[in-house]
Amino acid sequence: MLQLQLQNKLPIPGKTNLDWYLFDQMMSDYHNQPMLEVGVGRGGSAIAMSEHTNKLELIDSWDQTWPKKPVEDIFEKYEIPVKFIDGKSGSLDVLASIKSQYKFIHLDANKSYEGTLDDLEKYNSFCDGVICVDDYLQSMWPEVTRATDDFVKNSEWNRILIGNHQVFLSRKKQTPASRKITLKFPVVLRNDEVHLTYGKLPEDVDR
């Protein structure tokens, strides 16, 4: 699947090349462990996640510009096991349908402050591994960064790795994958956080 994505024969994640690499590496700790994506879009990130797990669940309301069927068709064509949960990320029906604890969650749905914070507050209880928040430090969506930083300040979650436009959160200070990344790349280390970003660092880090 990865080769087909690299050849542009399948949708790719809406990420920079560095962020795609970090996304892939951070999932490598959780081979065939339950994973969840909230906000599927065209399915590029979900396909990348399927490289690491056969226990993948996808939440989307499908009321944006992309339909569900092309994504569904890809997973059926390549016989990738996946469970679709249709609905808004914050809806009670969607939350009630979640029966798993996930090792990796990719949040890429809400871009407002309230929506991002609500997703983090609701979905962190379903995760005992890593949460990746997409569009962190993305200038188009500043409220994502603000909401994520406020969530971290008021919870036991830590920012352990910051890429171009995404951040990885964990209750731990490090994961095996984040340690390997630290050894491979020139990074900025501050308060146990690893920064690989050309964006403005979070305000509490600047200070």
Language model features with spans:
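N-terminal, positively charged/glycine-rich alpha-helical extensions of SAM-dependent methyltransferases
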Residues: M1-L4
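S-adenosylmethionine/decaboxylated-SAM
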Residues: N8-P13, N17-R207
